[in-house]
Amino acid sequence: MATGELKPRWGQPLTGIISFFVFFAIAWLLWFIFSDSRGPVGWFPYPFVMYLAMMILVGIWQHMLLGDWPFQNIEQPKRGIIMTIANLVLVWFVIDVIFYRILGLGFNFMNYYGLEAIEKPVVMAQVAVVCFVLIGFYTFPVSTIFFGKWPVQPSNLTQPAAGFAEIAWGSFWTLICYSVLIVPFFGSVFQGPALNSSWWVTLGGTSHVHWVFGWWEWAIVILFMTPNVWRMKPWSLITVPQPWKGIISVIISMVGAAALAILCKKIIPMWVPAETFQLLEEAKGASEVQRFFWLHSAEIAGFFLIPFLIWHHYFDDIALGLNRDGWAAFFLRTIGVCALAAGSYWIFYYGNFGHWALGNHHMTELSHRFAHGESLVWNFWWIIPLLWNEWFFHKWPFYIHEE
C-alpha cells in the first residue's frame, strides 16, 4: 500500500475544480433518482432526508471515531466501496432496528410501526430520527474537534475499543441534549402528561423544533469550520488543558451560534418578500412566521457546508500565496466561504435551482420559495459524495500518494 503524502493529482486549483463538478454531478444524479418528484422514487423530503442524515452520522462513527476499523488496511478503491456498503447496512439497522423497534418500544413517537398501528402520522418517527442526527452532528464529533478526544484519549485503548468508547461517550451527551431539546416538541405534538411540552415558546415565539434547528445548525457549522478552513483557529488561542479548553470552546461556539441565528432572524426580512410572511401568518398565525425565521436561519447555515468542506479538503486551504496557517489566510477563507455561501443561496432561491434542477414544485412563485424550498435537504445531500470520497476513499482518484 502506498504510504507517501497525498498530493492533488492535477495540481491546484484544477484538482479542486474537477472534484467540485464531479461531486455536484453525482449528488444531482442521485437526487434525481431518489428525491426529485420527476424521478423514479420521489422520496422528498421524507424519508429521503432521514436516510441521508443518518448516512452522515454513521459515517462520522466509521471514520472519525473508529478510524475506518476494521477496513483500514484494505487498498483503495476497494476499501471505499466496502465502507460505503457497510454504511448503508448500518443506516438501515440503526433506523429500522434501534430506533423503530428498540427505542420505539418506549417512545412511540420513534416507532414507525407503532404510529402506523394507531393511525398517527408515521412521518413523525422519521422526524424523530432526523432530530437525533441533528443533535449528533455536534455531540459526537465535538469530543474529537474541541476536546482532542478527551476523555477517551490519551490512553492505551486501541481500535475498536477506543472508537466504541467515543461512540458511548457521544451517545450519552446526545441523549441528554435530545431529551432537553427534542423530546418536548413531541410532547407538544402528542399531548399528554407523559412528555413535557416545548419549554422554549417564550424564547423562540414558536413551539416547533425548528427553534432548535435555527441555532444548532450554526453550532455545527462553527464546529466543523474549526478543523477545516479555520485550521483550528481561533480555539488555538485557548491554552488551558482539557477538558477546560473543550468546555470553553463549546460555550463560545454555542454563544456564537445563537448570535448568528438571531442575526439571521433580524436580516431575513431584508430580502424575503413580505408576501411570504403574510401567507405564513394567514395559514397558521404569527408563531408560524417565527418558526420560519428559525428554520431559514438553519437553511442559511446549510449553504456554508460545501464551500468550507471543499475549500479545505480539495483546494487544500488555498490562500492566494498567504501563509495557510496565518490569521490573514484565516480571514480570507472565512470571507470567501461567506461569499460562496451567499452566491449559492442566490442561485438556489432567486435562480430557482430548487425548482428547475431539483424538482421542488412548491417553488414556482418567489413568495413560496423561501418557505418551502427545503434547501437544507439539498445542502446535506450535496456534501455526501465529498465526505464519502474523503472519509472512505481517502480522496481517490483525485489525490495520489507521493513516490
Task: Please give the residue ranges for each predicted region.
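Cytoplasmic membrane-interface regions of multi-pass membrane proteins
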Residues: M1-W10, V58-I82, Y138-A165, Q191, ...
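Long, charge-rich C-terminal accessory regions
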Residues: S207-V212, M225-M232, I248, I252-V255, ...
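Membrane-helix interface and helix-disruption motif detector
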Residues: L30-L52, F71-P77, V97-C131, V180-W216, ...
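N-terminal signal-anchor module of multipass membrane proteins
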Residues: M1-Q62, F132-L134, F380
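Alpha-helical membrane-inserting segments
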Residues: I26-L30, F34, W61-L66, L90-V94, ...
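Long, compositionally biased low-complexity segments enriched in polar/charged residues
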Residues: L14, F20-W28, M55-V58, L88, ...
